[in-house]
Design a protein with these regions (language model features):
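Short edge beta-strands and adjacent beta->alpha junctions
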Residues: 28, 46-51
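N-terminal module-boundary/linker segments of secreted carbohydrate-active enzymes
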Residues: 38-45
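Sec-dependent N-terminal signal peptides
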Residues: 11-16
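N-terminal export leaders
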Residues: 5-9
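Charged, glycine-enriched surface loops/patches
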Residues: 172-193
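A short, structured surface patch at a secondary-structure boundary
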Residues: 57-156, 162-169, 184
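C-terminal motif of bacterial Sec signal peptides marking the signal peptidase cleavage site
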Residues: 20-21
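Bacterial Sec signal peptide processing site at the extreme N-terminus
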Residues: 24-34
């Protein structure tokens, strides 16, 4: 089954779409009894990741340079008994995102996905996008600290489903590790590359 561009965009959390830039090395798709590879999604412009589509509607996003793999599972999909090693599962819908990377906000806005963001690493007055600023001023999005000093209590209370960081997070690996210890997947977006 070949997905249309609209279906592909709907199937992925908006955070995964901020990956663009350098060429990604080809990777072998994961195949298990539960995950049956269907096809590699052809990417015309984004080259910093690969997307492998599976028969059950799952998509495996691989970011080779960061050695990161996210398996995006469709809403309502059964829990997998076996997850390939090194793969982080994101169950749709991904909600209560902690968006630290300001450059990614525009993509969320264009995908009409602002409602999936609950937390920001930028204060309201720091936003250059009116929609983000207004969402923070009205309390729809809360400030949860910058990348190097997040408010872990607020992030946990919000039941954060994903932290979208920029590459600065790699300068404070202890923060990334702590978020992951709390069970929060961390995506280091690379749109500035």
């Amino acid at each position: 089954m070949k997905l249309t561009r609209a279906q592909f965009l709907k199937a992925l959390p908006a955070a995964a779409l901020v990956l663009a830039g350098c060429t990604a090395a080809p990777t072998a798709p994961a195949d298990t009894d539960e995950l049956v590879f269907d096809h590699a999604y052809p990417l015309d412009y984004a080259t910093q990741f690969t997307a492998d589509c599976y028969a059950d509607g799952s998509t495996l996003l691989t970011i080779p340079d960061a050695q990161v793999k996210f398996l995006v599972r469709p809403e309502g999909a059964a829990t997998l008994h076996t997850v390939p090693e090194g793969v982080t599962v994101l169950q749709q819908p991904v909600q209560n995102i902690y968006l630290v990377s300001t450059s990614a906000m525009d993509l969320f806005l264009h995908l009409d996905a602002l409602d999936s963001i609950a937390l920001s690493g930028t204060r309201a007055e720091g936003w250059y996008l009116d929609e983000a600023k207004q969402a923070m001023q009205t309390g729809r999005i809360a400030y949860a600290g910058k990348y190097s000093a997040p408010d872990y209590e607020r992030i946990l209370t919000a039941e954060c489903g994903l932290a979208v960081e920029n590459t600065m997070i790699y300068h404070t690996p202890e923060v990334k590790e702590q978020l992951e210890r709390f069970g929060i997947p961390v995506l280091g977006e690379r749109s500035s590359y």
